[in-house]
Amino acid sequence: MHGFSKAIDIICRYEGYKEKATADPVTGGHPYTFGYGSQFYPDGSPVKAGHHVTKQKALEFLNNEIYVIDTELDKLHLDIDSSMREALISFIHSIGWEAFLYSSVIDYVDASKYHAAVDEMNRWIFDASHK
């Protein structure tokens, strides 16, 4: 795995640390998140209401998620530098892998249309209609 200090910093800053699992603001329930936005434990089991996590464990879970996302990104064979890779990792952590696959971001990045990719990422992050 590459060093992903920027992605970790971005995720930690914007997600914030939550010791106790919180409900999704859109559904009012599932998926629950805790730590720095983790929805799943490293073994794949989901975070549930009432679960708690320490900051240390939350960082371990985040590093595991980043490793998984990075491994999946490798399979797409995108020609991206480390800054774009970290931005994509942060984005994917925020919206999820499935949503990323169905977004236009991959096509824009693959076509080197980076401004369009950023615009699309902003729509997913800040536009409630995508959630």
Region roles according to the model:
Residues M1-G29, S38-V47, V53-T71, L78, ...:
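Long, amphipathic alpha-helical surface segments
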Residues G28-P31, R85:
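A structure-centric signal for secondary-structure junctions around beta-strands
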Residues A87-S90:
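Amphipathic alpha-helical interaction segments
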Residues H77-M84:
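Structural motif
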Residues I92-W97:
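Short alpha-helix boundary/capping elements
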